[in-house]
Amino acid sequence: MLQPKRTKYRKPFLVRHDKRKAHKGNTVEFGEFGLQAVTSAWVDARQIEAARIAITRRMGREGNVIIRIFPHFSKTSKPIGVRMGSGKGSPEKWYTAVKVNTVMFEVSGVSEEIARDALRLGGHKLPVSWKIITKSEGDNQ
């Protein structure tokens, strides 16, 4: 699973994610087809990994998958049954904030039918609404 090698602070303050549109990372740059977010949400490292596995299994041995999002923020939690107080909990999961129009995954080297089907399967693993775009569609947004 994806997580940072090092962070400046292990436990961040409350991180708020912006629900506005993404102005960077909103076009297909490296592949031919992309999975673009239509809504904003927090995406967990496990969800990113589940989507990546679903996409690569559908594509078989052909083509490339490019992951365009990375979980930078840690989410802390305390164990169940622990009383209030005595400090902040330990980091449990890693998240990223996905804005509207962010391209999350890109696919290249496969036919359009396989690429659309693979991205559809991967999109169902994510907590955001999405659409599939091509490299030419991303230019005119």
From Swiss-Prot:
One of its GO terms (molecular function) is rRNA binding. InterPro entries: Ribosomal_uL16, Ribosomal_uL16_bact-type, Ribosomal_uL16_CS, Ribosomal_uL16_dom, Ribosomal_uL16_sf. GO terms for biological process: translation. Keywords: Ribonucleoprotein, Ribosomal protein, RNA-binding, rRNA-binding, tRNA-binding. One of its GO terms (cellular component) is cytosolic large ribosomal subunit. Binds 23S rRNA and is also seen to make contacts with the A and possibly P site tRNAs. Part of the 50S ribosomal subunit. Belongs to the universal ribosomal protein uL16 family. This is Large ribosomal subunit protein uL16.
